[in-house]
């Protein structure tokens, strides 16, 4: 009988071990291979993108990306708790990245809201207030980012922050030259009057510019130039789209 009680005690300890804590229902309900989780993440992002202040005229509606999700989950699984390289989060275009670490399973909506709340330290047209970090916010609302994919991992190798959240945004935002204006201020959808859904633009571009002066190059050299064919695809192929 005593032996049986000891075995029950050992079994109870195993149930509380770090290797199994991460598999509890609270964690598994956050896995992003579930359609309802994907919808929660996309809907929360679009809700917040609609609510920016001042309002934006060119903010794209976000959609789920399987490719971006695969990359985000791969990085989360490494449990390094730092940003990945740009190559690790590239699909056909480069993607940005937001990270979140937690001691306990946290709802995706709560995670995303925490990124958005950095707007309290952001002044449109000026940038971050002194000694403040706002990169999560600016990437979340970046006007041309429209594909999103996220992943979550349980990291027993970490002492405290055992839950690692990763979201990839494509195309990437936080362009240094535009970081104080992550979108164009104006009436919602003013930049896309014929491609609007509930205050967000739907005329997205699947290409990106790799040079900052593509518009002037298009005027001077034209899109048939070999340089523009490879470095200015958004400018040349997405003339009537947000990019």
From Swiss-Prot:
Its main location: secreted. Keywords: Disulfide bond, Secreted, Signal. GO terms for biological process: cell-cell adhesion. It is found in: Secreted. One of its GO terms (cellular component) is extracellular region. Residues 42-169 form the SCP domain. This is Cysteine-rich secretory protein 2. The gene is Crisp2.
């Amino acid at each position: 009988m005593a032996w049986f009680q000891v075995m029950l005690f050992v079994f109870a300890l195993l149930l509380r071990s770090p290797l199994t804590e991460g598999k509890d229902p609270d964690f598994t309900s956050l896995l992003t291979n579930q359609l309802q989780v994907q919808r929660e993440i996309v809907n929360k992002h679009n809700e917040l993108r609609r609510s920016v202040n001042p309002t934006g005229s060119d903010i794209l509606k976000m959609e789920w990306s399987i490719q971006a999700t695969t990359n985000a989950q791969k990085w989360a699984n490494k449990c390094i708790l730092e940003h990945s390289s740009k190559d690790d989060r590239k699909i056909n275009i480069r993607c940005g990245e937001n990270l979140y670490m937690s001691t306990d399973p946290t709802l995706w909506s709560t995670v995303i809201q925490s990124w958005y709340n950095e707007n309290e330290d952001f002044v449109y047209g000026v940038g971050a207030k002194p000694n403040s970090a706002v990169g999560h916010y600016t990437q979340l609302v970046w006007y041309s980012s429209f594909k999103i994919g996220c992943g979550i991992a349980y990291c027993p190798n970490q002492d405290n922050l055992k839950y690692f959240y990763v979201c990839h945004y494509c195309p990437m935002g936080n362009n240094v030259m535009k970081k104080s204006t992550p979108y164009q201020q104006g009436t919602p959808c003013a930049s896309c009057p014929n491609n609007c859904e509930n205050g967000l633009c739907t005329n997205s571009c699947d290409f990106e510019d790799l040079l900052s002066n593509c518009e002037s190059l298009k005027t001077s050299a034209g899109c048939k130039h070999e340089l523009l064919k490879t470095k200015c695809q958004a400018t040349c192929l997405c003339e009537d789209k947000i990019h």
